[in-house]
């Protein structure tokens, strides 16, 4: 990022407390969609007027309360998505309640979770995304303790349990699966959770050029299985 008013990215972004990403995204989404709705409303009203089919008794009330929930598929795809980004500490732990609330709201906000399975930004402490037996800061191995003593929180399964969201669990080792999931999730009218295995070379103790290999081993060993879940595809 950068310091206001400078922006190094080709799109708008905001910085905030790292656990607040989903909550901030909800507010941005409402303002963003309100602005888009004004434009779509003007276009629809003009089309009705030109066709001579505008009926005040029907359309006045409709356009008074017109919002993103009435967008057509074409209109929805014209709206730049609102994307919240966070690591496992932000989304699995301290900000999980914010993420859960956002998913239950049904707002089509997209959340990218970079799952390193440790607190990479504060020194590699253990977190709930790590596996049982993991050795890391705050989860030592010795005569009394044998690494992390808690089982892993499965974010993707929790996302599915909300029954409102598109869920992708992916890895850079399988790029086709990853890109297809991103496209499906971004185009979905639902919230989306992209839970992505992210190698932290320093804390995982692997070489700088070994991220793809490490990701491949995580997938093939079934430690990090790949899947996509779309509630709109029906009962499976």
Predicted regions and their residues:
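Glycine/aspartate-rich loop-and-adjacent alpha/beta segment that forms the canonical ThDP
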Residues: 6, 180, 184-236
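Short gly/pro/ser/thr-enriched loop/turn and capping motifs at secondary-structure boundaries
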Residues: 116-121, 201-203
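Active-site glycine-rich loop that binds ribose-phosphate moieties when present
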Residues: 149-155, 175-179
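Short catalytic-loop micro-motif centered on adjacent basic/acidic residues
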Residues: 84-86, 166-171
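Hydrophobic/aromatic ligand-binding patch that stacks against planar heteroaromatic rings
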Residues: 101, 158, 184-185
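Cofactor-binding active-site loop characterized by glycine-rich and histidine/acidic residues
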Residues: 1-111, 118-120, 124-134, 145-150, ...
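Short, conserved beta-strand edge motifs with alternating hydrophobic and charged residues
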Residues: 113, 169-170, 193-197
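Active-site glycine- and acidic-residue-rich loops that bind
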Residues: 89-93, 171-179
């Amino acid at each position: 990022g950068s310091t206001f008013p400078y922006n190094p990215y080709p799109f708008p972004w905001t910085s905030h407390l790292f656990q607040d990403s989903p909550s901030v995204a909800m507010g941005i989404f409402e303002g963003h969609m309100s602005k888009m709705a004004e434009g779509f409303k003007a276009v629809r009203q003009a089309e009705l007027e030109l066709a001579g089919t505008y009926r005040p008794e029907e359309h006045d009330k409709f356009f008074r309360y017109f919002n993103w929930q009435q967008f057509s598929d074409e209109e929805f795809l014209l709206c730049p998505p609102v994307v919240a980004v966070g690591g496992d500490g932000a989304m699995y732990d301290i900000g999980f309640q914010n993420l859960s609330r956002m998913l239950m709201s049904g707002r089509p906000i997209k959340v990218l979770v970079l799952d390193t399975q440790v607190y990479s930004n504060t020194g590699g402490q253990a977190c709930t995304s790590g596996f049982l037996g993991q050795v890391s800061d705050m989860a030592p191995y010795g005569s009394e303790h044998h690494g992390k003593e808690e089982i892993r929180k499965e974010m993707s399964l929790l996302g599915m349990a909300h029954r409102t969201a598109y869920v992708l669990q992916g890895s850079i080792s399988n790029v086709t699966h990853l890109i297809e999931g991103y496209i499906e999730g971004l185009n979905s009218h639902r919230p989306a959770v992209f839970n992505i295995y992210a190698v932290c070379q320093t804390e995982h103790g692997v070489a700088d050029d070994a991220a793809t290999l490490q990701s491949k081993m995580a997938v093939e060993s079934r430690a990090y299985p790949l899947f996509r879940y779309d509630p709109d595809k029906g009962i499976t």
